[in-house]
Swiss-Prot record:
This is Large ribosomal subunit protein eL15. Belongs to the eukaryotic ribosomal protein eL15 family. Coiled coil: none annotated. InterPro entries: Rbsml_eL15_core_dom_sf (IPR024794), Ribosomal_eL15 (IPR000439), Ribosomal_eL15_arc (IPR020926), Ribosomal_eL15_CS (IPR020925), Ribosomal_uL23/eL15/eS24_sf (IPR012678). Keywords: Ribonucleoprotein, Ribosomal protein.
Length: 186
């Protein structure tokens, strides 16, 4: 019971990080994170409450990786050929994929033997966004014998980050909304 109360307060603190202890905590951690590699495997999640809500368990077979991704909309090169600057189509163009989905795909490429379960936002500064990605090892016996997660071991869940089967992928493909009115989302 005590853990659930703790998670409740952690959730509230992360909802408004500027008004809670989270801002000071990140001010200490961010200089270290900037010097570390872009993708780094970490021992335990920074936001344990969020990770557990998304399916993380502290046992063998589960891995958490933190990734740094650039901020902002799509980087599009300027045309060399002549045209009206208005028709160049350089500014205000966003990509099809969200930055979170890009983060999941990059981590999946780094760890090809693991499957992406889910991911969540951790922090952002002027240049980058930081996400933590929860990965699962489908070959691990503790995962294969756990009825709550062994669905990820089947072949139809291979490379799920690249096929948009994670939560961020489904959101970007417009699959969160159903029924009347959702026609233009997809």
């Amino acid at each position: 019971m005590r853990c659930y109360i703790m998670y409740k307060y952690m959730k509230e603190a992360w909802k408004n990080p500027d008004e809670s202890y989270v801002k000071e905590l990140m001010r200490e951690r961010l200089p270290k994170w900037r010097r570390q590699p872009v993708i780094i495997r970490i021992d335990k999640p920074t936001r344990i409450d969020r990770a557990r809500r998304l399916g993380y368990k502290a046992k063998t077979g589960y891995v958490v990786a933190r990734i740094r991704v650039r901020r902002g909309s799509r980087r599009k090169s300027r045309f060399k050929n002549g045209r009206d600057p208005k028709r160049m189509g350089v500014n205000k163009i966003s990509g099809e994929k969200s930055i979170q989905r890009m983060a999941e795909e990059r981590v999946a490429r780094k760890y090809p033997n693991l499957e992406v379960l889910n991911s969540y936002w951790v922090w952002e500064d002027g240049k980058a966004k930081y996400y933590e990605v929860i990965l699962v090892d489908p070959q691990c016996p503790s995962i294969q014998h756990d009825n709550k997660i062994n669905w990820i071991c089947s072949k139809k869940h291979t490379r799920r980050a690249f096929r948009g089967l994670t939560s961020a992928g489904k959101k970007g493909r417009g699959l969160n909304k159903k029924g009347k009115g959702a026609e233009k989302v997809r």
